[in-house]
Amino acid sequence: MMPGQIPDPLVTAGSLPSVGPLAGFPATTLTEQLKLAELYRLGTVLSPLMLNRHAKRPFDAIKSEDDDDDERKKRRREKNKVAAARCRNRKKERTDFLQKESERLEMLNSDLKSQIEELKSERQQLIVMLNLHRPTCIVRTDSVKSDEHPLEPRED
């Protein structure tokens, strides 16, 4: 190409014959390697492993892999969101169940306590009645016959 000529868009650096250490590498690979080398030189957070891993593949493959990674992350986030919602629902159901069970047991406890109070009151009334009856009672423990003839009438 002569000075002042407009370059032909069909002619690329990779299609021109060249001599030197870069001969035989496609232009996209060289461009990508130069970009990564510049990023690495500027001190970005690319490790040598990442640099070596990406430097051997064309930009489209890297972009496709990044898209795949993004898609995988998106699917994982979505699955995690669904799992978290399920977990919250189970926890809420368990809490509701335990709350209802607690209320039921409290009611049962209250009923049993009132029943205990009724029985204590009835017992107290029976004790009072028994104490009132004792002075007038005909049957005494000393006059009860032995168990040999429990049905025989008493002699008095």
Curated annotation (Swiss-Prot):
Residues 72-94 are annotated as: Basic motif. PROSITE patterns: BZIP (PS50217), BZIP_BASIC (PS00036). Disulfide bonds: none annotated. GO terms for cellular component: nucleus. One of its GO terms (biological process) is regulation of transcription by RNA polymerase II. It is found in: Nucleus. InterPro entries: AP-1, bZIP, bZIP_sf. Residues 98-126 are annotated as: Leucine-zipper. Component of the AP-1 transcription factor that represses transactivation mediated by the Jun family of proteins. This is Jun dimerization protein 2. It comes from Danio rerio (Zebrafish). The lineage of its organism: Eukaryota, Metazoa, Chordata, Craniata, Vertebrata.
